[in-house]
Design a protein with these regions (language model features):
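Catalytic phosphate/metal-binding cores of nucleic-acid and nucleotide-processing enzymes, i.e., regions
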Residues: 1-119
Length: 119
């Protein structure tokens, strides 16, 4: 099942889905290790997403980084058949959540039995 990205204000929970907030600390939500450190208001959405993709790619090189640990955790859920929804404020606009979903799906597809992470 593909990972979905939804707007935190507009998404209605479906039975059995796992919802994970992936944004910055805001409006009572804690900072996610996958929150985008680059703001669209400071250089435009495209630039923020380009910078985020590079940031996440680098973070995933160190399995001990908080971002990598969270992607691994989410990939294990997806590999196990979970219906995962990533929540952010900007969806359905282009969103860093789409980049996270791509990374999670890619890793989940490569995982072995029991959620083992490939070398």
């Amino acid at each position: 099942m593909p990972v979905r990205v939804a707007n935190i204000w507009k998404h209605h929970r479906s039975e059995g889905e796992i919802r994970v907030y992936v944004g910055r600390a805001c409006r009572g939500y804690p900072q996610s290790p996958l929150g985008n450190p680059y703001r669209a208001s400071e250089g435009g959405r495209d630039q923020a997403l380009t910078q985020y993709r590079a940031w996440l790619t680098e973070a995933l090189q160190d399995a001990r980084s908080p971002a990598a640990a969270e992607v691994i955790r989410l990939a294990r859920l997806v590999a196990g058949g979970a219906d995962l929804v990533l929540l952010c404020w900007c969806a359905p606009k282009d969103c860093h959540g789409d980049i996270v979903a791509e990374a999670v799906e890619k890793l989940a597809a490569r995982m072995g039995p029991g959620g083992t992470v490939p070398a």
